[in-house]
Swiss-Prot record:
Name of this protein: 2-C-methyl-D-erythritol 2,4-cyclodiphosphate synthase
Site feature (Transition state stabilizer) residues: 36, 135
The keyword Metal-binding is assigned to this record: yes
One of the Pfam families matching this protein, by short name: YgbB
NCBIfam families hit by this protein: ispF (TIGR00151)
Note describing how the cofactor binds: Binds 1 divalent metal cation per subunit.
GO MF entry, a single one: metal ion binding
Cofactors named for this entry: a divalent metal cation
Native organism: Shewanella sediminis (strain HAW-EB3)
Length: 161
């Protein structure tokens, strides 16, 4: 198969003393996200999408939250590992589309920086990376500012042999 599509979804609750990292970018906010790793919910959803596209499970399988080795882990390292696995199967980035679902913080000022980080990690142009944000109009846990949800869809393309 020459193309593969993967979908990823992740949620993290606000809390703790860690800084808020989204898409590899530090976002000024009153709190971070509770997680076993650094809590970068954007990179977790993308990692799941990449793994799903090449039928390699999910990040919980590769980086279990019961393993102390991954406590506080840099999610960019985890993402790069997932992408390396896809490249080992002969795939490279076609395009990526990410939706950040959060009432707060406002994401618009940070979108371009996130796109640049992702383009760097996926060794591609920012034209292949889309990041957008939306709210739930104050409905649900994201609307109550209890956490952030992220959906990611990735298209991987088989490299020419």
């Amino acid at each position: 198969m020459n193309i593969r599509i993967g979908h990823g979804f992740d949620v993290h609750k606000f809390g703790g003393g860690s800084p808020l990292l989204l898409g590899g970018v530090h976002i000024p906010y009153e709190t971070g996200l509770i997680a076993h790793s650094d809590g970068d919910v954007v990179l977790h959803a993308i990692s799941d999408a990449v793994l799903g596209a090449v039928a390699l499970g999910d990040i919980g399988k590769h980086f279990p939250d019961t393993d102390e080795e991954f406590k506080g882990a840099d999610s960019r390292h985890l993402l790069r590992h997932c992408y390396r696995l896809a490249k080992e199967k002969g795939y490279s980035m076609g395009n990526l589309d990410v939706t950040i679902i959060a009432q707060a913080p406002k994401m618009a000022p940070h979108i371009e920086a996130i796109r640049e980080v992702l383009a760097l990690d996926f060794e591609t142009d920012t034209d292949n990376i889309n990041v957008k944000a939306t709210t739930t109009e104050k409905l649900g846990f994201t609307g109550r500012k209890e956490g952030i949800a992220v959906e990611a869809v990735v298209l991987l393309v088989k490299s020419a042999d």
